Amino acid sequence: MSLKYTCPSCGTPLGYEGLCWKCKCEQERQAALAWMPEQIVEKQRNLIQNIQRLADMEDPEFADFWQLLGYHDAITPEIQRAALAAEVFWPCEIYYHAPADVRDGLIHALLSAEYSSAASNLMSCLAMQGDDKAMETLLELERNPRPWRKGLYVDPSSYAQIGGWTFDKEGQKIQLNFDTCYPMVKGTTSEKSPVRIGRAREDTCPHCGGRMVDMLGLDGRDERLKFLGINGILTATCCPSCVGFLKGPAFNHFTLDGGVEIFPSELFDGAEKADCYVSPEDYKALTENPFVLGEAPVPLFYGCASEDVNTIGGFANWVQDAEYTTCPHCGKPMKYLAQIQWDTVFDCAEGTLYVEFCPDCHIVSMQHQQT
């Protein structure tokens, strides 16, 4: 059955009149990126005056917050102080690198908390603030748990990961993300780019028989990618159909000359075989997608403001909880590298692929999340 309408921007068949969701996201992003300085100030002022509406996920405050943070890095200490005064502790990103007085207010609230739900939100906020005193507080709570710890699933060191860092048993801080972010933008398949999403391979998946794909190929020698510390090529390879059905992430070892060794994997239900849900048309769309690395860096939360953006570095737009994989070789937490929104590379796909890597062991992990 053919659909009655098409998107006037990209031609995607639709069951309704108007823009498809991806073109609508792009339109909203371009409008937000074009805000004049006085518009940014007005939105900041409105957010301060109506900060409770942010916690209630009310627009325009909710949308304005994510666009101010993701596209302009414009969450000010005044906004953070207003949030603290109103006891708005969600979304936790509002407290990213907040000043010392706000940090101290968060610590006071956390150490006064009686219930696990409040402690959970406050530890997330403190993780986003992320300075040495924030770490000392979470470390102390890990070593000397409060009664509310029994109501939580994970330790404070896991909450720290929300802010892109954690600490080990000795109290040493470990950085889990990069303080630089680049977007993947639409170019052409023939355009030269140090990063490519979805490169076709000849080998097949042992579970479903579908084609394996280099989901991310990245040349760290490009000047824009020097911040990654990869002096060569990183390749992340998996089965696009089965990666969401594995017991844990997909792993591979990479060599700086572009080589890949794919690690064995198991399906989550213990089955030997699975159906392949990626059609030949989907493989074609995935391996011929036009994404190339953007020319200029963007704010660290650029990939968190919408669901149609693929990024290298910065922060991930976690569908569920922040999840940093443990390296299967050295046991250290891996560093977050990239996110690929499945629906940007072939139609009707759901969820996001998160790519992480161990710089020491040259091992990549790929994990899937969806609602």
Give the ranges of each region predicted by the language model.
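Preference for intrinsically disordered or flexible, low-complexity segments
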Residues: 2-371
